[in-house]
Amino acid sequence: MRIYVCVKQVPDTSGKVAVNPDGTLNRASMAAIINPDDMSAIEQALKLKDETGCQVTALTMGPPPAEGMLREIIAMGADDGVLISAREFGGSDTFATSQIISAAIHKLGLSNEDMIFCGRQAIDGDTAQVGPQIAEKLSIPQVTYGAGIKKSGDLVLVKRMLEDGYMMIEVETPCLITCIQDKAVKPRYMTLNGIMECYSKPLLVLDYEALKDEPLIELDTIGLKGSPTNIFKSFTPPQKGVGVMLQGTDKEKVEDLVDKLMQKHVI
């Protein structure tokens, strides 16, 4: 059994966000991190590896520097990594990205026992579309909002979170599960041995030439020009006013608050 974990290197949006003239993010100007929801997918895959001895393959689409992220995941416990990288793939929207990743997984092989884990959504786009689109392209069942995954005989038992609770779902393999951050799923750190060994583990690079003949990919709908989604406008919202911390006793703070509200004609 193999688990493909689809991960994405995203800009750290907690800092200043820069936008290119074409509406895409200026990723080079921002620090890169592993997408938070993807960290949960990594941890749940590694937990299953601990329990079943399965193989875990980290897979990403991105520029060559994304190799460093894959090495980090290997240092956490993944067995190997796959980097999908080509200029022709740059600027792909979710529809194009899901095609490319599906084609890569199809080329690598998806057996009847295999699974694909994705983070629910990426913080740079927040669409939550790529995971479900991969499942549709590969014609396999999918479960979203997974917060707990167990192998149960020939089935997979998934704890799917809801707004007011959760539901338990049994799904056959091969399947795709999108994972969310949950207090019960705490991503592990890289180990010292893992760091020392991660550069000796295999990392496969798939470029345009490797994937262009795959049946799941339509060459006229990939990349920035081929993507059917057009960004009409992208911008950084203006900074809001700075908050004010009131000091003193409770009585003094209440009086100060009333004064400030009266100055602004709120009361």
From Swiss-Prot:
Example GO molecular function? electron transfer activity
Cite the SMART domains for this sequence: ETF
Q: A GO CC term?
A: cytoplasm
Assigned keywords, A-Z: Cytoplasm, Electron transport, Transport
Q: Which InterPro entries match?
A: AcrB (IPR050044), ETF_a/b_N (IPR014730), ETF_b (IPR012255), ETF_beta_N (IPR033948), Rossmann-like_a/b/a_fold (IPR014729)
- Localization in the cell: Cytoplasm
What residue ranges are annotated as transmembrane?
none
Q: Which CDD domains match?
A: ETF_beta
One Pfam short name = ETF
Q: Coiled-coil stretches, from where to where?
A: none
* Subunit and interaction comment: Heterohexadecamer; tetramer of tetramers. Each tetramer is composed of 2 alpha (AcrC), a beta (AcrA) and a gamma (AcrB) subunit.
What is the purpose of this protein?
Part of the ETF-acryloyl-CoA reductase complex involved in the pathway of L-alanine fermentation. The electron transfer flavoprotein (ETF) serves as a specific electron acceptor for acryloyl-CoA reductase.
Q: Give the family per the record.
A: Belongs to the ETF beta-subunit/FixA family.
State what protein this is by name: Acryloyl-CoA reductase electron transfer subunit gamma
List the top taxonomic levels of the source: Bacteria, Bacillati, Bacillota, Clostridia, Lachnospirales
Recorded name of the encoding gene: acrB
